[in-house]
Amino acid sequence: MQRRPILVVNFGSQYVQLIARRVRELGVYSEIVHWDTPVEEIKKKNPYGIIFSGGPASVYAEGAPLPDKRIYELGVPILGICYGLQVITHQLGGKVVRSEKQEYGRARLRIIKEDVIFEGIPKESDVWMSHADKVVELPEGFEVLAVSENSPYAVIANREKKIYGFQFHPEVTHTVFGKEMLANFIYGVCKAEKNWEMGDFIHEKIEEIRKTVGDAKVIAALSGGVDSTVAAVLTHRAIGDKLHCFFIDHGLLRYKEREEVEKNLRSLGLPLTVVDASEEFLEKLKGVEDPEEKRKIIGRTFIEVFEREAKKIEGAEFLLQGTLYPDVVESAGIKGSAKIKTHHNVGGLPERMNLKLLEPFRELFKDEVRKIGKLLGVPEEILRRHPFPGPGLAIRIIGEVNKKDLEILRKADYIFIQELKKEGLYDRVWQAFAVLLPVKSVGVMGDVRTYEKVVALRAVESVDGMTADWARLPYDFLDRVMRRIINEVEGVNRVVYDISSKPPSTIEWE
């Protein structure tokens, strides 16, 4: 079903996906498009409205990302956020310059003219600013609706053409009434109608899967994580036992994870084949220390094992994947963005095995997949699982992977997670895990000098994993975890806690 969207034009903002998510939370379908998307393509999508995202560039710089000017002639309401406001100002004849006083962080917004965009919002409220450039001259037909101490053009509008600009970020939680302002733009200015409901999505997707697959068979490699599990449950609901699921144990799983995943997947009625390929993976990882090389070896071996097993299923024409909208957006990318890490999935498999891809969630965010899982009756313990990387513990052992170190890490990680759950902290963090470091340290245990391994604990808070802050866990709690690990895990005599945020660090160590 073709839904009328609110289009979010991406100028390279770290918040672009957050904007799209906020729109969907308000009940309207949103889609992200690149800033140089042709106007004809935008027109075809028949959007209710368009939101220009922020971005790191300066509109007056050479080669700055600027959309086709004909976008303003479509008669579609536009909202520019931060850099987006400056794009509108610059392209329509106003002036933007470098600000001598840059504005980052909380600011006080003061409304000076009433407008539908401020419906239900107090005269003064806190907003979040993040800009180094400023507007000094408005385009013809525009007026100022709100100001802040350092931004005399905090909210601008051409009311006749329904073009608005916010110098602040309404999508972040620090802007107290940001969601309400977005709702006012969507419903008050764009006159959009609600068209995004997870229950409707499930019914439509089941029909679509049935039509797409027909009498063919579908194969899936499941990890036990949220995305692949919910995708399998939805597909199984649509086509029954024409779906064949595989769980490959690569020997790099957490403590008792294989048994837990198998139990969970079978309890959901999924047709499952469990493959133990642990020796094969560990053999190929012998002597390998480089993290990128480890990821590649695991990815290649995974494909070989899965291909070998899947060939046993006659009539398989589709490969089910739990691809999400952020994966689609990131693979489209903003020109010039750098690859940070190789992502481990079954990439390359469809071509090799002559399979077509089935990606029921390619237009969804992770929180939406969780909502679907809930509606499909997937147990909370699966939906609340922390993300776990495809290469498993191999990228949490810094350096070469061997059975002894895997055993040490499994035990330490299990204690950490167990204590988080016991203390009611597990659901408060986005991800938590232990890392085994390639260093030894001197210690004293029972009056005897020791020289043993160091374990690092990592816990982060995040919304989508794209940015993350280290979790401020209570000292008493960390003390208890440290004592348990050192007393119960042979070969460890020191525990440290990682307090790095993303950026500059990544969540995983490798």
Curated annotation (Swiss-Prot):
GO cellular component terms, A-Z: cytosol
Top EC group: ligase
Enzyme Commission (EC) number: 6.3.5.2
Keywords, ordered alphabetically: ATP-binding, Glutamine amidotransferase, GMP biosynthesis, Ligase, Nucleotide-binding, Purine biosynthesis
Catalytic activity: XMP + L-glutamine + ATP + H2O = GMP + L-glutamate + AMP + diphosphate + 2 H(+)
Entry-linked InterPro entries: Class_I_gatase-like (IPR029062), GATASE (IPR017926), GMP_synth_C (IPR001674), GMP_synth_GATase (IPR004739), GMP_synthase (IPR022955), GMPS_ATP_PPase_dom (IPR025777), NAD/GMP_synthase (IPR022310), Rossmann-like_a/b/a_fold (IPR014729)
GMPS ATP-PPase domain mapped to chain residues: 196-385
Residue ranges of every copy of the Glutamine amidotransferase type-1 domain listed in the record: 5-195
Pfam families named among the record's database cross-references: GATase, GMP_synt_C, NAD_synthase
Metabolic or biological pathway, per its Swiss-Prot or TrEMBL entry: Purine metabolism; GMP biosynthesis; GMP from XMP (L-Gln route): step 1/1
Keyword presence, Transmembrane: no
GO biological process: GMP biosynthetic process
Record note on quaternary structure: Homodimer.
Function noted in UniProt: Catalyzes the synthesis of GMP from XMP.
Protein name listed in UniProt: GMP synthase [glutamine-hydrolyzing]
Species classification: Bacteria, Pseudomonadati, Aquificota, Aquificia, Aquificales
